[in-house]
Amino acid sequence: WVWKGDEEIDIPREEKDTTRFMPIDKPEKSPYGYAEEQIKMLNGIKLHEAGFKGEGMRVAVVDAGFMNVDRISVFDSLRLLGTHNVVFPGRSVFIGDDHGTKVLSCLAADAPGLMVGTAPQAEYWLIKSEDSRSEFPIEEDYWTAAMEFADSVGVDVVSSSLGYFSFDVDALNY
């Protein structure tokens, strides 16, 4: 089975439309903000204190999309090397699905008092390999292409929280 759907629809955004990103209260006490519990579980604070914040590392985040990463303030200091859309070549990875945005925030956010990720000083490639409109085996090929692209641009680490075992057609499940 190979599935090919309609191309993604780009919905134009007005540059001045920031109403969806209202200021939120900063949590008190910790420079890690909302990420404090998460980074404590990984002993990340000790790593940061020892100077390990991702500097010199190239990380590829392979996911379903990175909606509004280019507009969210916790990513203002993001060291973005580039983006690549395997599903819709040439299209922006910053529209559509936001799962990759959430994953990236755990890694790259750098807004002390609000949220600091585990590797805020790393350099990042954002790669879209998931077509979130449906689930078909072709997405495994997209994922493989994303891994090959990440390797070709010299990344050190890949973060991918995608998995495939259940599809829209039951006969394709494993």
Give the location of each predicted region.
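Short, acidic/polar
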Residues: 142-147
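Autoinhibitory propeptides
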Residues: 1-38, 48
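Short acidic, glycine-rich surface-loop motifs adjacent to enzyme active sites
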Residues: 148-174
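Subtilisin-like serine protease catalytic core
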Residues: 35, 45-140, 153-156, 167-169
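Conserved residues at the C-terminal ends of beta-strands
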Residues: 3-5, 130, 161
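Hydrophobic C-terminal alpha-helix "anchor/cap" residues
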Residues: 1-2, 107, 150
